[in-house]
């Protein structure tokens, strides 16, 4: 009997040629499709197509399968050390993972930057705005709502988080570039006359989580918690080293 599932999974983005299938020799989607030996790539649907170089702790993909969730996770996790599936939820057939309640991205900033100065500028993005000046142009409606911005300090530096129902292409990275350029200044980011073309590096950006209020995801394996922690440490080490060496 075929069941439909959402799987939460993470990946180290800089180890791939991009996210979307067909994007170079080794994309994240192509890696999953190849691992599961799927005859039809359309059997996989994804919640977020992250920019090249962006990592994730909890993206979501949808699949219909006769296999057990444990088997799906085991196959993917055993075939690539840079992708890990860590939890699942059974859903109705045909459900689109893109329609979520909240997506949260976090951006890691090594060094002595203070949260207070970042938040002064970042707070200008809160609320419902036209983000066409802070995204790469496509056919989608550019109006988006930033529901929450948070900042906290870690041992390596600070982490800035953005939560919204959806984001546009390059939106978070352009917002970050603006915040870093004008940090400490309380200005209206939407008062800029032209498209803001600066963009923050992708390697520091991580898709932290995707929330569906009606779903409760079940962890697949205690060992995967350890694997997730190892991936977090690997990302932090890479980001810190990259910022030190340039």
Curated annotation (Swiss-Prot):
Q: Does the keyword tRNA processing apply?
A: yes
**Xref: InterPro entries:** PsdUridine_synth_cat_dom_sf, PsdUridine_synth_TruA, PsdUridine_synth_TruA_a/b_dom, PsdUridine_synth_TruA_C
Binding-site list for substrate: 105
Q: What is its EC number?
A: 5.4.99.12
Q: Which reaction does it catalyse?
A: uridine(38/39/40) in tRNA = pseudouridine(38/39/40) in tRNA
The record's Pfam families line, in alphabetical order, gives: PseudoU_synth_1
Q: Which GO terms describe its molecular function?
A: RNA binding; tRNA pseudouridine(38-40) synthase activity
Keywords carried by this UniProt record: Isomerase, tRNA processing
Q: What does this protein do?
A: Formation of pseudouridine at positions 38, 39 and 40 in the anticodon stem and loop of transfer RNAs.
Family recorded in the similarity comment? Belongs to the tRNA pseudouridine synthase TruA family.
Q: What is this protein called?
A: tRNA pseudouridine synthase A
């Amino acid at each position: 009997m075929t069941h439909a599932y959402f799987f939460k999974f993470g990946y180290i983005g800089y180890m791939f040629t991009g996210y979307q299938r067909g994007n170079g020799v080794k994309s994240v989607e192509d890696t999953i499709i190849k691992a599961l030996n799927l005859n039809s790539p359309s059997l996989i649907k994804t919640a977020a197509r992250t920019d090249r170089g962006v990592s994730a702790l909890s993206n979501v993909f949808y699949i219909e399968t006769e296999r057990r969730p444990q088997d799906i996770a085991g196959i993917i996790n055993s075939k690539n050390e840079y992708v890990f599936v860590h939890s699942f939820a059974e859903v109705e057939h045909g459900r689109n993972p893109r329609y979520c309640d909240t997506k949260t991205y976090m951006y890691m900033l090594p060094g002595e930057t203070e949260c207070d100065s970042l938040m002064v500028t970042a707070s200008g993005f809160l609320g419902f705005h036209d983000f066409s000046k802070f995204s790469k142009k496509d056919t989608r409606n550019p109006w988006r709502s930033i529901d929450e911005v948070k900042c906290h300090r870690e041992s390596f530096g600070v982490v800035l988080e953005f939560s919204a129902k959806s984001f546009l292409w390059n939106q978070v990275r352009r917002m970050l570039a603006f915040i870093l350029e004008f940090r400490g200044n309380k200005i209206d980011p939407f008062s800029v006359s032209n498209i803001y073309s600066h963009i923050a590096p992708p390697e520091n950006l991580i898709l932290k989580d995707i929330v569906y209020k009606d779903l409760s995801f079940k962890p697949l394996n205690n060992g995967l918690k350890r694997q997730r922690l190892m991936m977090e440490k690997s990302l932090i080490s890479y980001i810190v080293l990259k910022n030190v060496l340039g």
